[in-house]
């Protein structure tokens, strides 16, 4: 492991790794050939200095090379966030994914159990009856028959087991909190990507572009949410076929009322599942508003809506027509078949 020690020494000195060096270092980390002390020192030094774009690209490349892939139809997207906003909000991206799929855009959702919240995507979907941890063939069938699948990160990124104990011991977030959301097993090239730190928005959008994404909205709410928020404005860095654009969204621009963080605060998986089901049954509340806003963005990124207002209107109709309820029912049925 002389090469890893060399890379560790570079990072410990405060200097950045090249993309190729980062790829090699993360190949070593994910192969289980690095001692816990070396891994902890490496991740700590990276976190203290801050990861460069080349380091993130190299690390994601190592992750993607080891992941269990899923075959997805052309035009599939993901709606995902880095987590870590400590808001305890409802499962916004999960409901937004259901609404987007109900509008005819295939969604290959990638996620995990709760880390800093009480209910992650895997937790709430399991509470809704969706079978979690399916193999790639079953996930492809979910996409084909329901227009939506949920790829459980632990199933697709088995190499993460080599660094999991070290991550648990460290009292801060590491680069791996970014790598999961950046490593979609279906290889989607369009994403609504939420970040909990505003400083991550532009560099992670460039990282996604480097890795092959074509259309991305990287979003950060003014309240700290890693979603498009309804409590105020949201900063967006958009990637559209190689061009970058910065703008701010306000929910009132698409006729949605302002909410408070308390309005968006959820609970445990059963509580959040009940709230999600209530929205699909027609409840009009802050959870519905923030979900249709994020689904509207998903439709824009997918090229299925010409504007955010059009996307929001289509997401509203997916609820009111019962299409979204049907999408979830099909996902439950197909995942358990």
Curated annotation (Swiss-Prot):
InterPro entries: Anthranilate_Pribosyl_Tfrase (IPR005940), Glycosyl_Trfase_fam3 (IPR000312), Glycosyl_Trfase_fam3_N_dom (IPR017459), Glycosyl_Trfase_fam3_N_dom_sf (IPR036320), Nuc_phospho_transferase (IPR035902). Pathway: Amino-acid biosynthesis; L-tryptophan biosynthesis; L-tryptophan from chorismate: step 2/5. The keyword Signal does not apply. Its EC number is 2.4.2.18. Mg(2+) 1 binds at residues 93, 227. GO terms for biological process: L-tryptophan biosynthetic process. 5-phospho-alpha-D-ribose 1-diphosphate binds at residues 81, 84-85, 89, 91-94, 109-117, 121. One of its GO terms (molecular function) is anthranilate phosphoribosyltransferase activity. Binds 2 magnesium ions per monomer. One of its GO terms (cellular component) is cytosol. It comes from the Bacteria. This is Anthranilate phosphoribosyltransferase. It catalyses: N-(5-phospho-beta-D-ribosyl)anthranilate + diphosphate = 5-phospho-alpha-D-ribose 1-diphosphate + anthranilate. Anthranilate 2 binds at residue 167. Mg(2+) 2 binds at residues 226-227. It comes from Methylorubrum extorquens (strain CM4 / NCIMB 13688) (Methylobacterium extorquens). It holds the Pfam family Glycos_transf_3.
